């Protein structure tokens, strides 16, 4: 999980301009990290590229926290 989390953290920091310390597993993209719906779409696209996978729109809607992303990605690798 550590490597996956660190890769996700880097993407979130770069995309949302938040401090790395704010990107915790329980952090909500919208409530804690200030992402709007466009930010979330762009994050999903970057995650797909980084981890070489496809996240369906239906699955993307279920992803609310950093931990959700880690769980989703690790479940598909």
Swiss-Prot record:
Signal peptide: none
InterPro entries named in the record: ACP (IPR003231), ACP-like_sf (IPR036736), PKS_PP-bd (IPR020806), PP-bd_ACP (IPR009081), Ppantetheine_attach_site (IPR006162)
One of the Pfam families matching this protein, by short name: PP-binding
Protein's UniProt keywords contain Lipid biosynthesis: yes
Keywords: Cytoplasm, Fatty acid biosynthesis, Fatty acid metabolism, Lipid biosynthesis, Lipid metabolism, Phosphopantetheine, Phosphoprotein
Gene Ontology cellular component terms for the protein in this record: cytosol; membrane
O-(pantetheine 4'-phosphoryl)serine: modified positions: 37
Post-translational modification: 4'-phosphopantetheine is transferred from CoA to a specific serine of apo-ACP by AcpS. This modification is essential for activity because fatty acids are bound in thioester linkage to the sulfhydryl of the prosthetic group.
Carrier domain sequence ranges: 2-77
Primary subcellular site in the record, as a coarse category: cytoplasm
Gene3D superfamilies on file: ACP-like (1.10.1200.10)
Molecular function per GO: acyl binding; acyl carrier activity; phosphopantetheine binding
Superkingdom to which the source organism belongs: Bacteria
Subcellular locations according to the entry: Cytoplasm
Family: Belongs to the acyl carrier protein (ACP) family.
NCBIfam families reported in the protein's UniProt record: acyl_carrier, PRK00982.1-2, PRK00982.1-3, PRK00982.1-4, PRK00982.1-5
Protein name stated in the entry: Acyl carrier protein
Lineage of producing organism: Bacteria, Bacillati, Bacillota, Bacilli, Bacillales
Gene that this sequence comes from: acpP
